[in-house]
């Protein structure tokens, strides 16, 4: 089984818009699927990690035979985030095929 892992900068550290980054992520994820990758792992941090997870979930829900593993640092990792990011995190976690918390 071939896997892709996502890690990336937080949104405030980026010099491109969310829309530009998400479009780039989608192109690369589609290319990875074409190359035979089926499992995608996200560290679930704000920014690139969650955006990538959202793209994977959307493509999976539209019929791509892929899986998302959410590898979150620990339960409650998102508590200090804005409500918007907390919602996106919770939605991605709920949609993931596998959820793992790395630290107790």
Predicted regions: what is each one?
Residues 1-104:
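Acidic/glycine-enriched connector segments
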């Amino acid at each position: 089984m071939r896997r892709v892992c996502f890690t990336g900068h937080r949104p405030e550290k980026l010099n491109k818009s969310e829309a530009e980054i998400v479009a780039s992520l989608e192109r690369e994820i589609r290319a990875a699927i074409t190359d035979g990758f089926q499992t995608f792992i996200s560290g679930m941090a704000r920014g690139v990690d969650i955006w990538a997870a959202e793209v994977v979930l959307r493509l999976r829900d539209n019929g791509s035979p892929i899986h998302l593993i959410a590898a979150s640092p620990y339960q409650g990792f998102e508590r200090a985030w804005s409500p918007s990011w907390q919602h996106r995190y919770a939605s991605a976690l709920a949609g993931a095929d596998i959820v793992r918390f790395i630290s107790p």
